[in-house]
């Protein structure tokens, strides 16, 4: 008789990130490699949309950086910035110094871009990425935690939450018209 062990108890440290997102990857590079294999077409679409150099940056982040090296919130924010083509802090500083004749970018804050002003194809890719890595809807009645960090604030809400919000706006408009 052959015995097989069906499961192993593994301790996974979860890192707090924006409400609605859960990335419980114990070994992020290995799990991202598995996700890339299972979602090959999606990852090709990302490469074709964002350019080869940016895709190479993402692959390095996804496949080589552990949770100890890059916390979950930073992992998501960096992925989002690259996928949506937000300029990095270094690029922003270079752009500001070129336009204002300044050489220091340490005192200026990065410009926040709204999701409505971005390329819909890139927004769609970002949302697909979030679905690939997993969303966990917040528990109703959840207690308020400490205010989110700037890295957590930069991560957009769940597409499900955005859809629910837009549906309720449409219903309100219909009620007003009636």
Swiss-Prot record:
<dbReference type="GO" id="GO:0005829">
    <property type="term" value="C:cytosol"/>
</dbReference>
<feature type="region of interest" description="Disordered">
    <location>
        <begin position="89"/>
        <end position="115"/>
    </location>
</feature>
<protein>
    <recommendedName>
        <fullName>Uncharacterized protein C191.01</fullName>
    </recommendedName>
</protein>
<feature type="compositionally biased region" description="Low complexity">
    <location>
        <begin position="98"/>
        <end position="109"/>
    </location>
</feature>
<keyword id="KW-0539">Nucleus</keyword>
<feature type="compositionally biased region" description="Acidic residues">
    <location>
        <begin position="167"/>
        <end position="178"/>
    </location>
</feature>
<keyword id="KW-0963">Cytoplasm</keyword>
<dbReference type="GO" id="GO:0005634">
    <property type="term" value="C:nucleus"/>
</dbReference>
<feature type="region of interest" description="Disordered">
    <location>
        <begin position="136"/>
        <end position="178"/>
    </location>
</feature>
């Amino acid at each position: 008789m052959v015995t097989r062990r069906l499961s192993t108890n593994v301790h996974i440290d979860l890192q707090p990130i924006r409400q609605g997102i859960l990335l419980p990857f114990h070994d992020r590079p290995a799990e991202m490699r598995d996700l890339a294999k299972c979602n090959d077409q999606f990852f090709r679409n990302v490469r074709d949309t964002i350019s080869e150099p940016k895709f190479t940056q993402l692959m390095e982040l996804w496949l080589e950086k552990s949770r100890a090296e890059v916390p979950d919130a930073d992992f998501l924010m960096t992925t989002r910035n690259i996928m949506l083509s937000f300029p990095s802090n270094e690029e922003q500083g270079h752009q500001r110094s070129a336009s204002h004749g300044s050489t220091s970018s340490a005192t200026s804050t990065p410009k926040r871009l709204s999701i409505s002003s971005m390329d819909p194809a890139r927004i769609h890719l970002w949302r697909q990425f979030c679905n690939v890595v997993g969303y966990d809807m917040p528990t109703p009645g959840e207690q308020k935690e400490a205010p989110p960090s700037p890295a957590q604030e930069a991560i957009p809400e769940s597409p499900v939450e955005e859809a629910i919000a837009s549906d309720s706006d449409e219903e309100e408009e219909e009620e007003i018209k009636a």
